[in-house]
């Protein structure tokens, strides 16, 4: 587990190779890493591949040897991730600015766009400044809590507050998963650690700071209430989940079923995977967290193996972006080729989980 923590620390440090050149943040410490990331792309690509493969290998080793940590280590992992730079996405900056628009500028991010506040220095290192908020109202309201830190006038404090907020929901999701795994699979505790230590989940949540765990925390809480025959609470929390990012609304039909009629986690994971393909031009890696959150609770181990394999490919598919430095062709094709190719790991992982 010490090696796992060290590799995680290296990934946290690696994240600063992608720091936007317009963001003068920790500058004395991060300038060498920025130079590596932006001007030595072949080398930084090899480093990413090497770190990712090592991290996944250590992840599987910990699962095989049952070398799993206590909650204190999970808190340490979360703490380290708070200080990382969101290396593969600018979404976190949009979360922050949407909250700032409401709290500081008294503007509606669904009717106005960030570009209308061009004097704000945050726009120097933001993307998608010409579009209104794409998230559901539930997330925008929730983001106002960490957004209150904007009243300090300090960007760094607001950034850390948002990271802490998202890390808190990651820990909350783990708490619910622990209860669900204990209830549904008392002799297979590895299912919990399969999600808790998954490299894709850690990178996309604790480094990149995506809000998907907020949606999935509420969805899994709804499922837990459903298992306990609290249908009204389940329905309410599922609606709250959909109010974050819409996707989990597809789970509503499954909450009308009960007993042995259907493996809810299995079908939920497949339904959420299908949602990803409704916008094939935006097959973002972090969307896989939706399906994987339920896949670890699915009864068929082949399905667990398939989704675990997809998480491997979902992280490695950033490789073309790092190498080319943009998202234009041939990056889109290469990214999806890597992702599809990761399916060849499914039978190997199936043997691994059955061993």
Predicted regions and their residues:
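Loop-to-helix entry region of an early transmembrane alpha helix in multi-pass inner-membrane enzymes
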Residues: 42-45, 137-140, 151-172, 180
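Intramembrane catalytic core of multi-pass membrane enzymes that act on lipidic substrates
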Residues: 68-161
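Transmembrane-helix signature of polytopic, membrane-embedded enzymes
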Residues: 67-70, 177-199
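Membrane-interface alpha helices of multi-pass inner-membrane proteins
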Residues: 202-204, 231-254, 270-277
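Transmembrane helical bundles and short interhelical boundary loops of multi-pass, membrane-embedded
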Residues: 1-51, 264-288, 292-355
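Transmembrane-helix motifs of polytopic, lipid-linked glycan transferases
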Residues: 4, 53-62, 160-184, 216
């Amino acid at each position: 587990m010490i090696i796992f923590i060290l590799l995680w620390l290296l990934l946290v440090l690696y994240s600063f190779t992608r720091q936007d050149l317009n963001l003068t943040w920790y500058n004395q410490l991060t300038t060498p890493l920025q130079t590596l990331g932006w001007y030595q792309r072949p080398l930084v690509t090899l480093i990413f591949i090497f770190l990712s493969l090592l991290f996944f290998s250590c992840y599987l080793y910990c699962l095989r040897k049952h070398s799993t940590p206590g909650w204190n280590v999970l808190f340490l992992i979360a703490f380290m991730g708070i200080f990382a730079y969101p290396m593969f996405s600018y979404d976190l900056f949009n979360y922050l600015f949407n909250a700032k628009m409401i709290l500081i500028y008294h503007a509606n991010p669904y009717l106005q766009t960030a570009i209308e506040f061009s004097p704000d220095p945050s726009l120097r290192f933001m993307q998608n400044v010409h579009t209104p908020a794409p998230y559901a109202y539930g997330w925008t309201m929730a983001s106002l809590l960490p957004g209150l830190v904007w009243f300090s006038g300090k960007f760094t404090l607001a950034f850390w507050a948002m990271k802490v907020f998202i890390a808190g929901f990651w820990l909350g999701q783990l708490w619910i998963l622990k209860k669900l795994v204990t209830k549904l699979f008392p002799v297979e505790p590895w299912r919990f650690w399969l999600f808790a230590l998954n490299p894709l989940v850690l990178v996309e949540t604790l480094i990149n700071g995506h809000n998907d765990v907020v949606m999935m925390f509420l969805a899994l809480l709804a499922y837990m209430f459903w298992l306990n025959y609290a249908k009204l609470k389940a329905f309410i929390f599922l609606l709250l989940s959909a109010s974050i990012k819409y996707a989990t609304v597809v789970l509503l039909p499954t909450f009308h079923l009960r007993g042995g009629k259907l493996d809810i986690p299995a079908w939920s994971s497949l339904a959420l995977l299908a949602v990803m393909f409704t916008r094939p031009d935006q097959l973002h890696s972090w969307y896989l967290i939706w399906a994987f959150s339920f896949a670890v609770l699915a009864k068929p181990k082949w399905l667990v193996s398939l989704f675990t394999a997809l998480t491997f490919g979902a992280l490695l598919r950033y490789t073309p972006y790092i190498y080319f430095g943009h998202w234009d062709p041939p990056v889109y094709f290469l990214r999806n080729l890597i992702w599809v190719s990761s399916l060849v790991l499914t039978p190997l992982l199936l043997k691994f989980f059955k061993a």
